[in-house]
From Swiss-Prot:
Signal peptide: none
Lineage: Viruses, Varidnaviria, Bamfordvirae, Nucleocytoviricota, Megaviricetes
Protein name (database record): Putative zinc finger MYND domain-containing protein R331
Ligand binding (Zn(2+) 1): 328, 331, 350, 354
Key words, A-Z: DNA-binding, Metal-binding, Zinc, Zinc-finger
Keyword DNA-binding: yes
GO molecular function, a single term: zinc ion binding
Keyword Metal-binding: yes
ZnF MYND-type: positions: 328-366
Residues binding Zn(2+) 2, per UniProt: 341, 344, 362, 366
Length: 374
């Protein structure tokens, strides 16, 4: 039975949040220290929000009825038909995406009264809608074996905490040699200056590349006297990058979202191959219909690609990669000792002979020669 989270109306305020968030930001932590700091933050958040969060097991055959019944519990004298019901996408994660459900009375009702506010629900509304009374969080797990690629899943305590945290800071990844390290931040510019120890007059190189619905921003000094960053070069696919490289996921101009170590590692292995293969196939483009109301009050149906669709693309490609990860790009035989292109680091061969025979085809797809050390 799927588990939903029922969020009662509340006036939750996180007055001491800075004391728990600031120690996490803009600096390197080993995994043990980072988990300790996150657990302290989680304990603080949960102590405040726990009285308003209830997890409910829903029978599949009365799933929507159960949801609607809990949404209208503040109005025991009203019927289910006395409300408009709204569903909007909320935060998405590598294994699931969440939706927020709430209702709106159809009768004359005074909105925006503080006594009816659901402040946790307001945090979860990415459309910045004002959420009143009870709201509900639903989880959708990605499942590429199903027709729609998603199935109703369980909402957990960890999901709720992650959703709250997402409102206050993001994660980026630093690629240093062959390791990937997580950094937390609120201000991306300040993170870049801290990681690279920039002074006021210093500059930094930025390269933005789209890859499988991610919009990755690579920051580096691009000093060719430093080592070639193989992982960053492989993932961006276009230029050799040098030294330590900081990677952020910039959804839109100055709009950032999380980039986890797990996600970047998966992008790293999926970066092997031709640049042409990065293009999305027709069956990989997932669109959902939604209704908008124009200035004349007319409803218009539009199609939109949801942000979480990139996780389904990645899951499908990882499944394909598992079957081909040890194959020579040229002859398709199993690789015992890989020979990797030492410029783009994207193409693997089983022998130098295969590399030589494919070289004339690969040269146009390889790295930009202007970025290579002389």
């Amino acid at each position: 039975m799927p588990i939903i989270a029922v969020i009662s109306k509340n006036n939750c305020q996180f007055d001491d949040l800075e004391n728990y968030v600031l120690p996490l930001l803009y600096q390197y932590h080993d995994e043990t220290t980072r988990l300790q700091l996150k657990n302290k933050l989680n304990d603080y958040l949960w102590e405040i929000i726990e009285p308003y969060v209830t997890f409910i097991n829903c029978q599949s055959d009365i799933f929507m009825e159960t949801i609607c019944t809990h949404l209208v519990k503040e109005f025991p004298d009203k019927k289910l038909d006395d409300f408009f019901y709204h569903t909007e996408s909320s935060f998405s994660f590598p294994k699931k995406h969440t939706e927020l459900m709430y209702c709106q009375p159809t009768w004359s009702y005074q909105k925006d009264q503080e006594v009816n506010m659901n402040f946790i629900g307001c945090l979860f509304s990415l459309k910045h809608n004002v959420i009143e009374n009870t709201c509900i969080v639903i989880a959708n797990n990605y499942d590429i074996s199903t027709q729609n690629n998603i199935v109703i899943g369980d909402v957990t305590k960890n999901d709720i905490l992650r959703m709250v945290r997402r409102r206050y800071f993001f994660s980026a990844e630093l690629i240093k040699n062959d390791t990937i390290t997580k950094y937390y931040y609120q201000n991306p510019g300040y993170l870049v200056s801290k990681v690279f120890d920039l002074k006021e007059q210093d500059t930094i190189e930025k390269l933005t590349v789209g890859f499988l619905k991610y919009n990755l921003s690579f920051y580096c000094n691009q000093n060719k006297n430093q080592y070639v960053n193989k992982i960053a070069t492989r993932i961006n696919g276009l230029y050799q990058l040098y030294g330590d490289v900081l990677v952020l996921n910039e959804m839109d101009e100055h709009v950032y979202t999380n980039l986890s170590t797990h996600e970047l590692r998966r992008l790293n292995v999926l970066a092997y191959g031709r640049l042409y293969d990065r293009q999305l196939k027709a069956d990989e483009i997932h669109e959902e219909s939604h209704v908008e109301v124009d200035e004349q009050g007319k409803e218009i149906e539009k199609k939109k690609t949801p942000l979480w669709s990139k996780y389904i693309i990645i899951d499908k490609r990882m499944s394909e990669w598992q079957n081909n990860k040890n194959k020579c790009f040229y002859c398709n035989k199993n690789i015992e000792k890989p020979v990797v292109c030492n410029k783009c680091f994207r193409i693997k061969y089983c022998s130098e002979k295969c590399q030589s025979e494919y070289n004339s085809y690969h040269s146009d797809d390889c790295i930009n020669p202007k970025s290579i050390t002389n």
